[in-house]
Every structure is written in structure tokens, then in C-alpha cells.
Amino acid sequence: MLDIRPIPAFADNYIWMIVLPDGGAVVVDPGDAMPVINTLQRLNLQLTAVLLTHHHRDHNGGINQLRDWAKSNGQSFTVYGAVTSDYSDVLCRDGDTVDISGLTSPVRVLSVPGHTLDHLAFVVDNALFCGDTLFSGGCGRLFEGDAGQLYDSLAKLASLPDDTLVYCAHEYTLSNLRFALAVEPQNQCLQDYVKQVNNLREANKPSLPSTLGTEKAINPFLRVDTATVHAAVAAQAGQKVPDEVTCLALLRRWKDNF
């Protein structure tokens, strides 16, 4: 089982670190270098690789400082990211598999456009690092892509096994769940999950990881195929909802203004 640690950054980011048995570490989306450096030093680890999900600065802003720090210690690491990223040493495309020293299984690359056009997700064993595409109880805003792209991306992620652990990049869960309750107030699984997350946050613990099985039961953006979400969206928008992509687009607009 992977040893995955959250490194809090900024107001609500998580930089995820996979601690490797050989003393290495793989870091996902290091938007800030110092929390990563402090963790590496505290655990006496060497940074082996960086996985980049997309180009927003709160995800890649620490890479140059990390490179300078590694070089000053006689070390180096490899950055795996989109073909559009200036930081990428290895250019990753949908369907690629990447072998990283210290990981017992290859990293699978998924293209998941919507939040950004070049957004990637990485699957390592049963762990999904999905950046800002899928959140617990929500999904990322459409900054570059459209609802059709986001729908396909969420469907791709939802096709993974239900026990897949969801490591998204922000602690947005409680805010997302308030919206989810507005959409499906009678969803018992959602009500139970809200209590669970409240307990975790009151104990100052991350709400993550979630699981895909949980998200399919509580996340309205993965439930646009259900009658309850369709009805709620139609009532809120005051219009017919002819298909799931339209439902997702209207749901995202509702959330943007919630």
C-alpha cells in the first residue's frame, strides 16, 4: 500500500507526497516549494519525481525553487506533465504509462480536460491524483474547457474502480457539500458523509482522500444521470434539461453562483 502524505500549502491546497521505500519521494503539484523542502528534510527523503496535473501557479509555482534546492544538494528530479508545460521533462499524454524508480507499479496518465485544456490525472495503484478536475463533493470550474469535455473527463474518472482513493488538490469539501445538499437534500449517503467530514475537519484532519464509490453516491457532478439531480437543476434553471451534458453545464453554473 502506498504511503501518501498531505502537505498543506496556501489557504487550502494539498501537495501530495508519495513516500517511497527506497528513501525517495514523488510529489504531486508543488505549488509552493518550502513546505515540500521542509517535509523532505524532516523525513530525510530525496525528491525523485514530480507529477504535474495542470499549469495553474498554485500547482506548479514551486518547481524552479525545488530544482535550485535539489541542485544545491547534488540531486535532481524528473517532472512529468502535459506537453504544453514548460516544466515537463517527460511529456505525458492520455493512455501513457510511466515507470518511476521506487514505485512498484507504473503510473497511468489520463487526459481530463475541462478545468484547463491540458489537465492530466495520474493513477498510481489504487490512488487517483486528479488535481482540480474532481473534488470531493464537487468539480473544478470551467476556466478553459467546456461542459462536454468536463462530462467526458468525469465519466473517465468515474469508470475507475469504486475503491479508488481520490486525492484532489484542495480542501473544498465542506463548501462543496453545502452545495450538494442544496441539490439533493434527501440524499442519505450525502447526509452521512457531511457528518463524517465535519468530524474530520473539527479534529483538524484532511477530509481526503475520498473514494470514487463515495463520490458516485454524494457528488452531484457525478450524478447528472439521476432523476433527482436532473429535477433539481431543471427547477433551479427554470428550463428543460434535455441531456446529461446540459445538466452538468447548468449545475456548474449554479455552483459558480452559489
UniProtKB/Swiss-Prot annotation:
Family membership: Belongs to the metallo-beta-lactamase superfamily. Glyoxalase II family.
Cofactor, free-text remark: Binds 2 Zn(2+) ions per subunit.
Keywords: Hydrolase, Metal-binding, Zinc
The name this protein goes by in its record: Hydroxyacylglutathione hydrolase
Pathway: Secondary metabolite metabolism; methylglyoxal degradation; (R)-lactate from methylglyoxal: step 2/2
GO MF, one example: metal ion binding
Broadest EC class assigned to this enzyme: hydrolase
SUPFAM superfamilies hit by this protein: Metallo-hydrolase/oxidoreductase
Self-association and partners: Monomer.
Residues involved in Zn(2+) 1 binding: H54, H56, H115, D132
Role of this protein: Thiolesterase that catalyzes the hydrolysis of S-D-lactoyl-glutathione to form glutathione and D-lactic acid.
Biological process per Gene Ontology, one example term: methylglyoxal catabolic process to D-lactate via S-lactoyl-glutathione
Cofactor(s) required for function per UniProt: Zn(2+)
Enzyme Commission identifier(s): 3.1.2.6
Coiled-coil region list: none
Annotated positions binding Zn(2+) 2: D58, H59, D132, H170
Pfam family of the protein (one): HAGH_C
Reaction equations catalysed: an S-(2-hydroxyacyl)glutathione + H2O = a 2-hydroxy carboxylate + glutathione + H(+)
